[in-house]
Amino acid sequence: EKTVATRQKSVRAAAERQLTVTDSFLTGSYRRQTLISPLKQADVDIVIVLDSSYKSRGPRAVLDLVRQSLIEEYKKGTKISRNGQAVTITFTDFIVDVVAAFPRPWWAWDSSGLDICDSGRDRWITTNPKRHVEISARANRAHDGQLVPRIKQLKAWNRNAGDPLHSFHLEALAWSIFGTSWWWYNSQASDWAGARYFFKRAYDKLSTPLADPAGTGKDIAAYLHGDALQAARSMARTAFERCDRAQKALKEDDPATMHEAYRRVFGDCYTG
């Protein structure tokens, strides 16, 4: 954690030396406390909000500018590449994604959000990472601190299954299934057995759009379609069946079968 704190400050300072930055902050799963180890397999996300004068260059050119600016700072020895919606810095111990953003105009329907670069389609897309952090914290409080550990368990399943879901999609799906406020939620404990409910609901929910809970109007699940969608649903169904098998084994006083079933779902993260 100390390494991440030091590194993210260094990256933000590097960007600020090269560009006119009006704000910068840590975001993503690290900020929402849902990052799972090992850190080397994860991304740490940083948003840099740039002066509006850069925006006329267009999304792809803005990311190229950020990339070149960071190359000037880090020189040789560090891989820095444009990667979809971010500039990716590959350090030896973990990866940092630098997301270039611009404030939404005051008259926009979501003026508290940010426009970020989608270099693949050379377009701007709207997001609101600070609101995502607020939603995550509120949801975790509603579940008496048990939702963040639950999401980490689900991310362990996702990694063990070959990452069929994007990390944030998985989190938003968990918010949708378990609820995000004290007056509407499905109470959860962070035991392994409780994940069974998620997989049961996810099988159906994965086949429908999932609106960004921050109110940006974006479908978080839009990337998932065709064979990839069917594979993700199949994996959720398999995980449900294995969790169900584990619960039946527990009732039959067969701990060995229970542990094996959970281990097949959660991989090395299962500590039972």
Describe these PLM feature segments.
Residues 24-34:
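Short, solvent-exposed beta-alpha or beta-beta edge segments that form flexible loop/patches at the rim
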Residues 28, 78-82, 167:
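Short beta-strand
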